[in-house]
Amino acid sequence: MSRRHSAEKREVLPDPKFGNIIVTKFMNSVMYAGKKSVAESIVYGAFGIIESKTKQNPLTVFEQALDNVMPTIEVRSRRVGGATYQVPVEVRSTRRQALGIRWLISAARDRNEKTMTERLSAELLDASNNRGNAVKKREDVHRMAEANRAFSHYRW
């Protein structure tokens, strides 16, 4: 890891269907081995299932799901005098978004539905209703931060 320059942030283009940058980031996270067209069909397919099930705009369901999954606080290890403490710190907005996307996708991959499209749509619907493994992950992280609140004065 270079100490001189931090990597420049690349500009992410909005997706073709909804014109939303977050959907593009989500698509890029779903993508395996550079197969963007496959990732695109998975995400848009999941959005189609959501629209047919809920009769709502899938973008609002997606944004609600992401909001319910994004953490506001997390713990980071800090070594003080030979002891390692789990120090609760606030999460930056870019990291919040990245973690939320990552947790949604990993929770969807762990589900039992037949295709990834079905898994993703089911996880997004669950997350938008404050259920599912992605929301559970966020609550676990928040619980961990709450349990280690005594060490918050070690923040840096």
UniProtKB/Swiss-Prot annotation:
Q: Which UniProt keywords apply?
A: Ribonucleoprotein, Ribosomal protein, RNA-binding, rRNA-binding, tRNA-binding
Molecular function (Gene Ontology), one example: rRNA binding
Its GO CC terms are:
small ribosomal subunit
The cross-references to InterPro entries, in alphabetical order and at most eight, read: Ribosomal_uS7 (IPR000235), Ribosomal_uS7_bac/org-type (IPR005717), Ribosomal_uS7_CS (IPR020606), Ribosomal_uS7_dom (IPR023798), Ribosomal_uS7_dom_sf (IPR036823)
CDD domains (UniProt xref): uS7_Bacteria
Q: Which GO terms describe its biological process?
A: translation
Task: Tell me which SUPFAM superfamilies the record gives.
Answer: Ribosomal protein S7
What is annotated about its quaternary structure and interactions? Part of the 30S ribosomal subunit. Contacts proteins S9 and S11.
Q: What does this protein do?
A: One of the primary rRNA binding proteins, it binds directly to 16S rRNA where it nucleates assembly of the head domain of the 30S subunit. Is located at the subunit interface close to the decoding center, probably blocks exit of the E-site tRNA.
The record's family statement is:
Belongs to the universal ribosomal protein uS7 family.
What is the designated name of this protein? Small ribosomal subunit protein uS7
**Origin organism of this chain?**
Bradyrhizobium sp. (strain BTAi1 / ATCC BAA-1182)
